């Protein structure tokens, strides 16, 4: 498959990712005066067992993005169809004047029969995707960027609702030019993957 820069610009890349509360190494530096060891201002409350996690889904193109969807519970094929593909993917792909190819990986909910039938029924063209190849997808860089922005926040989320709200805000704040830059790297990604015979690349 020989995709040009324009071809890649007409692909919607999508994926799920999981973010954790208290995902740092757990160390916090506190500056205090003598005798203030147990002062409320000098005590950092820890979340046990990592504090839980939030799974999200998102899709990006060179021109726009879907809303970031927070997934509650386990994502089944039926939920993927009804909660993600129908409300978020179809409206963007089927918008007038658009000719968008849809990309998702080979996770079990993505390749289930009910999903394949739904995509075929709605004339959604999907991009064939090799197994176990996250370094090929530009949306992986979006997740990395979101993690960096999350860690830089002065007030770190301590509950799952706070984490969900922070992730949605971060997703919305990423400039579209950044998303386009990641997608425009696809030709280089594929070239490096071929040169590495399918092995690891710099991405």
Regions found by a protein language model. Give the residues of each.
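Surface/interface recognition patches
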Residues: 1-203
């Amino acid at each position: 498959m020989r995709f040009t820069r324009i071809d890649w610009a007409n692909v919607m890349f999508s994926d799920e990712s999981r973010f954790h509360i208290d995902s740092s190494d757990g160390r916090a530096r506190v500056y205090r005066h003598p005798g203030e060891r147990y002062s409320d201002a000098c005590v950092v409350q820890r979340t046990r067992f990592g504090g839980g996690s939030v799974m999200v889904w998102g899709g990006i193109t060179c021109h726009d993005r879907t809303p970031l969807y927070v997934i509650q519970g386990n994502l089944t094929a039926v939920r993927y169809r009804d909660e993600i593909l129908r409300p978020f993917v179809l409206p963007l792909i089927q918008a007038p004047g658009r000719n968008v190819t849809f990309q998702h990986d080979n996770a079990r909910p993505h390749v289930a029969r009910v999903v394949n039938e739904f995509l075929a029924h709605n004339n959604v063209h999907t991009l064939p995707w090799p197994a176990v190849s996250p370094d090929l997808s530009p949306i992986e860089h979006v997740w990395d960027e979101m993690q960096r922005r999350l860690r830089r926040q002065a007030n770190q989320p301590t509950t799952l609702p706070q984490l969900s709200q922070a992730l949605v805000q971060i997703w919305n704040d990423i400039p579209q030019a950044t998303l386009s830059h990641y997608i425009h790297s696809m030709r280089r990604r594929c070239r490096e993957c071929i040169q590495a015979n399918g092995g690891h690349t710099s991405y």
